[in-house]
Structure formats: C-alpha cells, structure tokens
A protein has these predicted regions:
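Hydrophobic-cavity lipid-handling domains and compact docking modules
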Residues: 51-113
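Intrinsically disordered, low-complexity regions enriched in Ser/Pro/Gly/Gln/His and often acidic
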Residues: 14, 48-51, 104, 163, ...
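Long, compositionally biased interface segments
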Residues: 155-196
C-alpha cells in the first residue's frame, strides 16, 4: 500500500503549481499551431474566466465558451479535437485539470486519450479527489486511452506527479511523435543520468 499512499501524496503536492504554468501551456499550444496542427488563433484563446475566488482555464471559442479545438495533419488520426480545462483558486491552488483528445483513426475507429486530476474541493464532493475504490484502481492523477472515455473496461493508468505543463507535453508527444514535441529525448535523458 505504501507506493499508492506516496503517489497520492505527490499528486496532492502538484496542486501547488506556480501560476506561470498557464503561459507555458499557451506556448505549447502555439508550437502546435506553428507546426500546422491547429488554428493559429489558439495563441489568444487559451485563457481564464474569473469565477469569484476561482479562474476556469480553457481553450475558448469566438463566443467565449469552452470548445474542443480541431486538430489537423496528425499522422495517426484522421480527425481529432483537443480540450483543456482547469480550475485554479486565486491563491494558485490547482483544484482540477483535464486534457483530452477525441478523434477517429483513418479506418474510422474511434480513439480517445485523457489525463485527469479530479476536483479536490470537498465542498464540491465530500471525498474531494478520492474517487473510485482506492488509490490503486483510481489514482488521483491518471490517464485513459481507448475508443472513448466511457467504454468498459474504463482503465485508469496512474501517472507520476506531473505538472499541467508536463501533462500537456506528454499528450502532445503522443499526438505528434516528432523531435519537436518530445521534451525528454533519450540523448538528453542519458546525458542527464551521466551528470549525476
């Protein structure tokens, strides 16, 4: 049980992410647009909406509402849409973060990927971010991969304590498997290990 307790503890710690993460996420989305995978206007459409003590961050449409951003020119998906949603307290505490991609492969089969850090507000949910049966089967920070986000078995793969920026980098590295979107090239990893 100790590894699962430790994992949950690290998931709680990432909620204290610096407020600068929103600018870094925007930079990753701009890089996606610059590579021709989404509309260039995305640079100004990932923004927060004030909700009193909170800000809701998402990719916004022309009318200001949340949208799933269409993606283009992906080698393994014929169609895809990306969504990013976050709830941040004015103190900087990250209450919730979700990034998802839903689309179709060239053969018409559906495909989805999502990373979730559930809302931890106990006023919103008595158990906060403790969902499911436990920290193993439903780790606080987890990902889904499958034909959609609902088809059983609804597998939740536990993720290490990654910041919102690192989660965005991971998702983009799955969508655009190129050097430009790989934040930890093996040559860099080996060099970092050698320096230790």
């Amino acid at each position: 049980m100790i590894p699962w307790v430790n994992l949950y503890s690290t998931h709680r710690q990432i909620r204290a992410a610096a407020l600068t993460w929103t600018g870094e996420v925007r930079k990753r989305l701009v890089a996606l647009a610059d590579a021709g995978h989404c509309d260039a206007s995305i640079r100004g459409r990932f923004r927060g909406k004030n909700r009193g003590d909170f800000a809701e961050w998402s990719i916004r449409g022309v009318n200001g509402g949340e949208i799933a951003e269409p993606l283009n020119n992906l080698t393994t998906l014929a169609t895809a849409r990306i969504t990013i949603l976050a709830l941040v307290h004015n103190s900087g505490h990250l209450h919730a973060f979700t990034m998802s991609v839903e689309g179709e492969r060239p053969d018409g089969s559906k495909w989805a990927l999502a990373v979730h850090l559930p809302d931890d507000r106990v006023a919103h949910n008595e158990d906060g971010d403790r969902q499911g049966l436990g920290g193993c089967s439903h780790a606080a920070l987890h990902c889904h991969v499958g034909p959609d986000l609902e088809t059983a078995p609804n597998v939740r793969v536990p993720l290490p304590a990654l910041s919102p920026v690192e989660l965005v980098e991971w998702v983009l590295s799955q969508l655009v498997p190129t050097d430009a979107f790989e934040p930890a090239k093996w040559s860099d990893v080996v060099a970092a290990l050698t320096r230790r």
